Amino acid sequence: KPLYFLLFALSPLAAAENIYAPGQAALKFNQWYIAQLDQNKPPVLNPDIMNDYVASGTIAAIKEMYSGDSNDKDMPDADMFIKAQDWDDDWNQITVLHSDFDAVCTNVYVAFGKKQDHVIADCLVEEQGKWKVRSATLIK
């Protein structure tokens, strides 16, 4: 009986960990991503280094977009993950605001900077037991 009680008592902790996993994954990804940009190493130019953070289908799409002559393709005006052409010095201060989910993904709302005036929603999916970014949408 004590073992059943212990398992029952610890089950909320496991559930809580699963609830927060997408937010933690989005936070880690954005911290890493901004650090790469600060070092002038845009990850989209070397997408294989994003395997720990970005969904495999998204990495394949990035490779396709950046293959060949960019003059033959429509290229995005803004970075596809931070949804901006440039970033402020304080964007390494990243805050997860909240999350919600739908049939497609878990959306994690992330704010950049002290004022939190740049907000994106990262669409995360679970891939081989890990939460990974599929796409990002500019919120404000």
Residue ranges and their predicted role:
Residues 1-7:
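Sec-dependent signal peptide recognition
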Residues 7-16:
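Hydrophobic h-region of N-terminal signal peptides that target proteins for export
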Residues 17, 54-114:
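Surface-exposed, charged secondary-structure patches
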Residues 19-24, 44, 114-118:
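Soluble non-cytosolic domains of exported or imported proteins
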Residues 20-38:
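Short, aromatic-enriched amphipathic alpha-helices that serve as compact interaction elements
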Residues 34-38, 42-67:
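Short, solvent-exposed secondary-structure junction/capping segments
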Residues 117-140:
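Short beta-strand edge/turn micro-motifs at domain boundaries
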